[in-house]
A protein has these predicted regions:
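PLP-dependent aminotransferase class I/II
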Residues: 31, 42, 53-66, 70-73, ...
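Conserved PLP-anchoring active-site segment centered on the Schiff-base-forming lysine
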Residues: 1-48
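Active-site phosphate-binding strand-loop segment of PLP-dependent enzymes
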Residues: 35-133, 138-140
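Nucleotide-sugar donor-binding loop of glycosyltransferases
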Residues: 4, 10-12, 31-33, 101, ...
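Short active-site oxyanion
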Residues: 4-5, 135-136, 190, 229-230
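Hydrophobic/aromatic ligand-binding patch that stacks against planar heteroaromatic rings
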Residues: 18-20, 89, 113, 178
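Helix C-cap/helix->beta junction micro-motif
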Residues: 23, 92-93, 248, 312
Length: 317
């Protein structure tokens, strides 16, 4: 509802927060864990314990009396949030979980697929995801009532299969049949896609550990089986490295700008102790990791990065 608060991480793609604002609700930003780069659930625990109160099984921000309507964890880069802790907080403070699993198709937490642990989960089939339909996505839920309502709204809220009767303002969010067929074919290849992603991530990590140990990959917990969607590392001078790799015909990209550094979200309340999101933004770079990347092409990337840091190029900038 308007002016409700939705807690989301400060490191995410802007679409996460845009979806909140579309409903006239307000994002409440939370910093991320420095190791996994996911929503910091201990920081969330401390915030909810000290700065909120419960009234009739509803959680409110003490300072403004605004209702906290949802927790929106984002499984950043295909890694996963500490869902065990988050589910405990959800139950304790009566705040439902809406999982942004747009990057996490094929990721698992304690044997459960991303997007299936909260009240609802959403996935993206954008062209840069592990499987694609060119665009669009998918919503999943264990709640049949929510599923029926979502389907109803996605078909222009049409109530009669023949006559043009509508009972509320709806949306044209249906996926066209041709793209859905593409998605089914892509899903059949998911095991191979996930296997190749894991191979690429393992090779990068092994190579950097052996020769460039200061390059730090995103860490995962023992509970998490990530899909390795986008191989991203923490390293020095990422802007200079990006420019250097571009001269070699190698495309890389930085991590998302923290949400509180974007003009439309700069005034959002931000829960942080150590500004981890800003530190990650200043030091992280995503490397080529498409399932179409050949082993030979990956070696070219690794060698170019090694050359940058060992030939004096890094020191020259």
């Amino acid at each position: 509802k308007p002016h409700n608060l939705v807690i989301a991480p400060n490191i995410t793609f802007a679409a996460t927060l845009n979806s909140i604002v579309y409903l006239n609700a307000e994002p409440l930003l939370l910093d991320v864990c420095p190791h996994t780069w996911q929503m910091d659930t201990q920081l969330l625990h401390d915030f909810l314990t000290t700065q909120t109160y419960l009234n009739q099984n509803t959680c409110y921000l003490r300072q403004t009396n605004q209702r906290i309507a949802a927790l929106m964890p984002v499984h950043v880069l295909g890694n996963m949030v500490n869902m065990q802790h988050l589910l405990q907080l959800s139950e304790q403070f009566h705040i439902p979980i809406v999982e942004d699993s747009t990057e996490a198709l094929g990721s698992y937490y304690m044997g459960k697929h991303a997007g299936t642990l909260g009240q609802t989960g959403c996935f993206s089939f954008n062209g840069n995801k592990i499987m694609t339909t060119g665009g669009g996505g998918m919503l999943v839920t264990h709640n049949e009532q929510l599923a029926r309502r979502a389907k109803h709204l996605s078909t222009q809220a049409k109530t009669n299969p023949v006559e043009y009767m509508h009972d509320e303002v709806g949306y044209n969010y249906r996926m066209v049949n041709l793209l859905a067929a593409m998605g089914v074919a892509q899903l059949e290849q998911m095991p191979q896609f996930l296997s190749r992603k894991a191979q690429i991530a393992h090779h990068y990590t092994t190579a950097f550990a052996a020769h460039l140990p200061f390059i730090q990959p995103q860490l995962t917990t023992t509970h998490t089986q990530p899909n390795h969607w986008l191989y991203t590392v923490k390293l020095p001078q990422w802007r200079n490295l990006l420019a250097h790799l571009r001269t070699q015909g190698i495309e890389t990209r930085p991590l998302w700008t923290p949400m509180n550094q974007l003009p439309m979200y700069a005034q959002c309340r931000y829960i942080t102790h150590h500004h981890v999101a800003a530190q990650l933004f200043e030091h992280c770079l995503s490397l080529p990791c498409s399932t179409n990347l050949t082993p030979q092409e990956q070696e070219v990337v690794i060698e170019a990065i090694h050359h940058f840091y060992t030939s004096g190029n890094a020191a020259m900038h």
